């Protein structure tokens, strides 16, 4: 029995959510394996219900599958029940679309969304039947590439990852695919050296690292790695058709990036630092993307994504026009957490004309002292005023994000979170 038949007939009937592993979602891409030259697995080291909503994976999936000679498939971290069955049977981790073992791919691309997924990456490599360490892999093994926010500090995963994409991956992923396409018969070393010549690609094997007597780690890089940056969001590739699952997701909606980067300097915010400079997408492009997404997916909610949506230069116009477009399809518009010191309540009112979901704010700290430490410049009265106005306009649910463990934090700062919420 081949792996596909084994998975469909004997393995998936034994797990609680088999629809997550079928690979037959609406807009999933299937190609003839004999008609492509390069096979890629885009691997997300978290559960399907979290990973399918990741916009970065949607973008890379669309970019690679537009190449006629490339087929990009997907794999997600197996849930405990599936992992137990795979281990018991000695079955390797497989791609969703074709049920091919990951070890048979030309390259595997991991999205490192956060440092907490590092161990899941190692587990997926192990479940694929591949050596964990990069220097133990042979010519026949796939090249393992990683990108995303967690790749900005590659050292913790350097022993296990062959190459890191530092920065935006929309352009780099095509260059990597073209590079490996031309070296399918090449040695592993030839592939790594070729990847190491690409802008924004860090190959640990090409960099010498030593530990001095005083314990300091020093590096002798072959060349300086410059972070890749997409400068024109209107010209940047985006998915023409989002994957629409048959299983329930944590965030069951489509996302459209309206802006990258952030003009604020919150001192705890990794995304605000690594996403610079600020870049915006035009309203015309956003409306076109909304129209295509609603028409091709049937999603009932579109999220306008950015680190601070209220700082979009034409925010009022954008929110009003987005709400009107969504209303035509009986859909909702949402935005991520909003900054209290820049939030205009009328923006929320504009999108609430379709369907009020909830408002999310990010105070992060509950005392003036700790807010000053992290550069969050607002007071309690601002929070109460904004929430009160939102409730008067019909919003019924408000969520606030707070952080515990910030530098200089005291017990008083933590207790103030509960006190502020009660008030």
Regions found by a protein language model. Name each.
Residues 42-46, 64, 243-267, 294, ...:
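N-terminal pre-triad scaffold of radical SAM enzymes
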Residues 48-51, 80-83, 116-118, 151-154, ...:
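Flexible loop/turn segments at secondary-structure boundaries
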Residues 77-219:
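Glycine-rich beta-alpha loop elements in corrinoid/cobalamin-binding modules
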Residues 269-285:
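Iron-sulfur (Fe-S) cluster-binding segments and ferredoxin-like electron-carrier domains
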Residues 40, 44-45, 51-62, 66-73, ...:
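Low-complexity, highly charged intrinsically disordered N-terminal segments
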Residues 11-41, 48-49, 204, 210-255:
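N-terminal [4Fe-4S]-dependent radical SAM core
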Residues 43, 292-399, 403-423:
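Conserved SAM/AdoMet-binding glycine-rich loop
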Residues 1-17, 67:
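Helix-enriched interaction subdomains in cytosolic or periplasmic regions
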């Amino acid at each position: 029995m081949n792996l596909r038949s084994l998975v469909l007939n004997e393995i998936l009937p034994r797990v609680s959510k088999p629809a997550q592993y079928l690979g037959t979602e609406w807009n999933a891409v299937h190609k003839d394996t004999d008609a492509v030259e390069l096979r890629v697995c885009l691997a997300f080291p978290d559960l399907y219900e979290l990973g399918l909503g990741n916009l970065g994976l949607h973008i890379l999936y669309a970019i690679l599958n537009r190449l006629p000679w490339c087929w990009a498939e997907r794999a997600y971290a197996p849930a405990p029940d599936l992992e137990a069955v795979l281990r018991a049977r000695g079955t390797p981790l497989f791609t969703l679309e074709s049920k091919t073992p990951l070890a048979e791919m030309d390259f595997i691309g991991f999205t490192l969304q956060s440092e907490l997924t590092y161990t899941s990456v190692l587990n997926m490599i192990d479940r694929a039947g591949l050596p964990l360490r990069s220097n133990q892999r042979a010519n026949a093994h796939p090249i393992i590439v990683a990108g995303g926010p967690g790749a900005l500090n590659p050292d913790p995963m350097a022993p296990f990852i062959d190459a890191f994409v530092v920065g935006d991956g929309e352009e780099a992923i095509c260059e990597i695919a073209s590079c490996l396409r031309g070296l399918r018969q090449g040695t592993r070393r030839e592939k790594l050296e070729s990847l190491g010549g690409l802008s924004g690609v860090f190959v640990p094997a090409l960099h010498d690292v030593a530990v001095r007597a005083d314990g300091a780690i020093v590096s002798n890089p072959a060349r300086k790695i410059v972070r890749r940056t997409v400068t024109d969001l209107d010209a940047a590739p985006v998915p023409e058709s989002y994957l629409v699952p048959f299983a329930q997701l944590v965030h069951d909606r489509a996302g459209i990036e309206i802006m990258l980067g952030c003009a604020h300097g919150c001192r705890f915010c990794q995304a605000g630092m690594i996403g610079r400079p600020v870049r915006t997408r035009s309203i015309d492009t956003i409306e076109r993307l909304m129209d295509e997404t609603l028409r091709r997916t049937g999603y009932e909610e579109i999220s306008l994504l950015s680190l601070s949506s209220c700082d979009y230069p034409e925010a009022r116009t954008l929110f009003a026009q987005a709400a009107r477009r969504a209303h035509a399809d009986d859909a909702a518009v949402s935005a991520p957490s909003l900054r209290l010191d820049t939030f205009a309540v009328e923006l929320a009112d504009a999108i609430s004309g379709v369907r009020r979901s909830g408002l999310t704010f990010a105070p992060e700290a509950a005392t003036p002292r700790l807010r000053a430490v992290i550069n969050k410049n607002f007071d309690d009265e601002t929070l109460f005023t904004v929430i009160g106005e939102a409730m008067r306009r019909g919003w019924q649910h408000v969520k606030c994000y707070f952080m515990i463990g910030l530098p200089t934090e005291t017990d008083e700062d933590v207790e103030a979170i509960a006190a502020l919420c009660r008030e």
